[in-house]
């Protein structure tokens, strides 16, 4: 299958390209050379590649940064999605598309609501999540008005080797490794009272490929582990593995204006459609992040 991946130079995009090629797909990745906010640029890429499958990953994804630039998040995440789907309808109307949304669209939930299912209401609590809700609306319009085969994926938190330090796990790992370098006895962290559902990025990209094959157009699928874990627990595991003597000190300036206390999803619908289930443990994922960041810092 010829597959196009937008946002291919990003953390997930790189893993997805590797997985698709390992499965025998003819996978072509585009990133900054295809400006998804420019309809002509998107059309040119689609006309050149003529994909049978499109994985639309290109997006702004840092939740914290979305508060300072919500307009740009809307431009990239919503207009970008519209341009990809409009272009596909013109050039490759039968192509199957996976739109990568986010579990952040669910917003603040109660513990008794967990694990979240796809029919649960959406109530975005930050500009990033709002942009993803709007992108989902664009996808539903494409399905309803043009009959495009667009499947919406809502991944919960994911992690793995190569993730940016804009995200919590690699950020903590980086600070712990820096503390070892500096001989420091403490690092600053943000709010560790929250609980999140983490999947390994390799499990996540495997789900994307399965959804291209077996997902139903217009349907939404959670990608989740089904288990919520406290960020404090994760930070302690990382501290024990890297620098047990280092204390964790909360810095109020690192706390987001609105924080979702707990998030956890059900992957039952995804399993029914594709037989997907998570295969990589959290401890394996954390170990991979540590090893990769040590290599990146020349500390292997």
List where the protein language model places each region.
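N-terminal Rossmann NAD(P)H-binding glycine-rich loop of SDR-like oxidoreductase domains
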Residues: 3-20
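Adenosine-cofactor binding site in Rossmann-like domains, unifying the SAM/SAH pocket
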Residues: 27-42
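NAD(P)H-binding glycine-rich loop region in Rossmannoid oxidoreductase-like domains
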Residues: 40-76
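Catalytic helix-loop patch of NAD(P)-dependent Rossmann-fold dehydrogenases
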Residues: 68-83, 96, 104-152, 163
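NAD(P)-dependent short-chain dehydrogenase/reductase
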Residues: 109-114, 138-197, 201-210, 228, ...
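Mid/C-terminal beta-alpha module of Rossmann-like enzyme folds, strongest
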Residues: 172, 214-255, 297
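Conserved C-terminal active-site "lid" loop/helix of NAD(P)H-dependent oxidoreductases
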Residues: 201, 220, 233, 252-284, ...
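Amphipathic terminal alpha-helices
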Residues: 282-300
